[in-house]
Amino acid sequence: CNAIENCSKPVFALINGTALGGGFELALSAHFRVATASAKIGLPEIHLGLLPGSGGTQRLPRIIGADKALKMMLNGQPVSAGEGLASGVIDRVEESGELISASMDFMLETTAGKHPRIPTRERTEGLQDEAANHVSIGEHRNTWQKKGKGLYSPFQIIDCVEKALSTPFEEGLKYERESFARCLESPQRKGLIHAFFAERRCSCLL
């Protein structure tokens, strides 16, 4: 992801279908994201007792702020391309389905200087309202303290997003890696993984 983000040429992520977890985290490292109208994006790692990796907890808040980023990560459900466009994480939605053609048009606009190439780690739109971000962190933490007893990853996700808002990118990325490792070792993660595969096996029998 860092290699993509650091590329000196504009990098476009074209999203057709569903980009969840690692696929969306990869798209976040691109400089621009173009999606079809039917596309879905999301970060469902919480359902497995994990947190978004590859810089997902650090890049998304820099674009859309703490509240929207936390809702996506803590809910774990896919959102539509239209919702992504409204939040700012998707740069363009192609209604006709001609994704490559639309992306080429966007690329030409970029080379003409209409859309500056800014690495996601350097984006600051989501960091501007410090007070709102601080309030959002507190509200989400309080909510999960009430309903998330016995769970581990929601609080790690909140802590990672808080780091994204208050520390340099590399420091936040290091914290994310350490938090991911802690989640991997948690009994909650092991239980949720077991439940996930048990549910899939049961569905095959129906």
Regions found by a protein language model. Name each.
Residues 177-183, 188:
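Long, low-complexity segments enriched in small/aliphatic residues
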Residues 25-29, 71-179, 197-206:
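Amphipathic alpha-helical segments at domain termini/boundaries
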Residues 3-48, 52:
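Glycine-rich beta-to-alpha active-site loop
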Residues 2-9, 37, 47-48, 57-81, ...:
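Active-site-adjacent scaffolding segments
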Residues 17, 40, 58, 85, ...:
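Residue-level "edge-of-site" marker
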Residues 1-17, 56-58, 63, 189-206:
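An acidic, glycine-rich surface segment that forms the CoA-thioester-binding/catalytic face
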